[in-house]
Design a protein with these regions (language model features):
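C-terminal helical cap/extension that packs against the catalytic core
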Residues: 66-122
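Phosphate-binding loop of NTP-binding sites
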Residues: 134, 147-153
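Nucleotide phosphate-binding/pyrophosphate-handling subdomain across enzymes
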Residues: 1-76
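Short beta-strands and strand-loop turn motifs
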Residues: 125-129
């Protein structure tokens, strides 16, 4: 019992799964690059307890994004999109009245946009709801680059 509690206290989570990268200027940056489908990304969005800037988009596996966008209600203040699905996710978001959207060309640009728009007390969440292919070799590479860019801020 004592041993289990000690291990639980030291456990920092699993890489790329709602992983806290750092807190900077009161903004917490989370890497959930493993959120490669809408269902996984919804769970990450629902785990956020402060206003959140969500980074979404990537390779189009034919997913629908209606439930993903509906999960934004009263949680997400800005959606920053990247990759092949940018237009599809943007159209779905606008269909449900969510219009605070910025599109970017690179992950570095995404991180810079998030840093400019997130305020003290906010969270920034990379939970793309899409595969990484096309821009990255895999979700691990995408997540590690995200962490590198965030740590360089």
């Amino acid at each position: 019992d004592k041993c289990v509690r000690a291990v639980a206290k030291r456990f920092t989570g699993v890489e790329h799964r709602i992983e806290l990268v750092r807190e900077l200027n009161g903004v917490k940056y989370y890497n959930d690059s493993k959120g490669t489908n809408p269902d996984a990304a919804i769970k990450a969005v629902q785990a956020m307890v402060t206003p959140t800037v969500v980074i979404g988009g990537g390779y189009d596996k034919g997913s629908e994004f209606d439930l993903y966008v509906k999960a934004f209600k009263d949680r997400v203040k800005l959606l920053v999109l990247i990759g092949q699905t940018s237009d599809k996710i943007e159209a779905t978001a606008k269909k449900y009245g969510f219009t605070n959207i910025i599109k970017a060309e690179s992950l570095k640009e995404v991180v810079d946009i998030c840093a400019e728009n997130a305020k003290d007390g906010d969270a920034v969440l990379l939970s793309p709801a899409c595969a990484s292919w096309g821009m990255f070799d895999n979700y691990e590479q995408r997540g590690r680059l995200f962490k590198e860019y965030v740590n360089a801020l």
